[in-house]
């Protein structure tokens, strides 16, 4: 299935997964950009969350990166739409709370994390089965690597 066919499938989990990839890039970039500002604690959380999201959204990395069994079992908890929605809600709430300290570019990360949470929640509410993108290593690609 090509990327265009995946987007035409109208499966909200695909939309959530690709929005999650955008979250990886934004959280990494904005975490570094805000590291020397008054929102340093929130930028560190944003930076750390980018690494968690990359392992959740790109299952191929769990196969090729040497990680502990504890970390693997933690990441494997997020296999359903509802669990991923919950993860993104928690991560977005943390970034929304950064506005208490003051306005910063972490707002962009909070918005995109919220959008991803909405996509996964819609997939769960409409009872769509979780469908991982083949481009990102889902649907049998990760199982082919031994």
From Swiss-Prot:
A GO BP entry: vesicle-mediated transport
Domain of life: Eukaryota
Glycan attachment sites: 11
Compartment(s): Golgi apparatus membrane
Transmembrane segments: 13-35, 39-61, 82-101, 106-125
GO cellular component, one term: Golgi membrane
Family matches, as InterPro entries: TVP18/Ca-channel_flower (IPR019365)
Keywords linked to the UniProt accession: Glycoprotein, Golgi apparatus, Membrane, Transmembrane, Transmembrane helix
Family: Belongs to the TVP18 family.
Function: Golgi membrane protein involved in vesicular trafficking.
PANTHER family membership: CALCIUM CHANNEL FLOWER HOMOLOG
Name of the molecule in the record: Golgi apparatus membrane protein TVP18
Organism of derivation: Ajellomyces capsulatus (strain NAm1 / WU24)
């Amino acid at each position: 299935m090509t990327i265009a066919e995946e987007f035409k499938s109208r499966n909200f989990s695909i939309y959530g997964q690709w929005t999650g990839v955008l979250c990886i890039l934004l959280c990494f970039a904005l975490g570094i950009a805000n590291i020397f500002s008054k929102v340093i604690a929130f930028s560190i959380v944003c930076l750390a969350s980018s690494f968690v999201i990359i392992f959740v959204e790109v299952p191929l990395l769990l196969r090729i990166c040497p990680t502990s069994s504890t970390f693997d079992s933690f990441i494997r908890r997020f296999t359903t739409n509802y669990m991923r929605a919950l993860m993104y809600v928690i991560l977005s709430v943390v970034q929304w709370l950064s506005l208490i300290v003051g306005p910063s570019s972490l707002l962009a990360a909070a918005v995109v994390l919220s959008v991803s949470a909405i996509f996964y929640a819609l997939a769960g509410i409409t009872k769509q089965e979780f469908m991982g993108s083949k481009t990102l290593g889902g649907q049998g690609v990760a199982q082919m690597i031994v």
